Amino acid sequence: MTEMSTETSPTNAAEPSRWRRKAILAASAAVAAVALVGCKADVISYELPAESARYTFQTETDGVTTAWEYTSDRPTEPDTPTSQPCIADVVLKETGPCRPEPLIFLRYDLGLGLDNTAEAGRLHPITVTGYYQDRLGTPPTVTELRAEASFDGGKVWRPVSTEAAGKNTFTARVKHPKRDRAPGGVALRITATDRAGNTVKQTIPEAYRLR
């Protein structure tokens, strides 16, 4: 059994009737605790094939789109800490080997001022860190990050230079135009890849504005 916990809701996925192995899509890791007190939890269960296959999982929340591509198969050994039980054990009352799906999540330090803006007409560094669900005992390492920026609402995307800045962490340097050349702010599109070949692409249509 595999488990997916995500901060957003799926917008398109394979038809459940074609899937045979249980995978849990939960609104958050807190769903297990919610189930324990008898509250209704936002949990969706799908059947996935037992054999290894490549999957795409897409979400959209408040205009931010995220697309994961990852490889999954039926686990033969559990890969979750004993202190954090599998959601399926609690919600679906199922037992057996369990592990989270190896989805890469992204954390941003945009280096903004107190007004959540950045200075126009200069090179601006941002920090992006890839991470995984806490339940994943042996996560891969994020090895590559590609960044793009748009100043016209996503019509034109410009490549942004990036460099490694620690484990799973990268610095991207965005060359800001003058403020009047980006009236709608700065959009970001980040693509990360880990050592196992899993990827995530996240598009933020208005990450921040210029001052």
Regions found by a protein language model. Give the residues of each.
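Low-complexity, acidic Ser/Thr/Pro-rich "mucin-like" tracts of secreted and single-pass surface proteins
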Residues: 1-28, 32-211
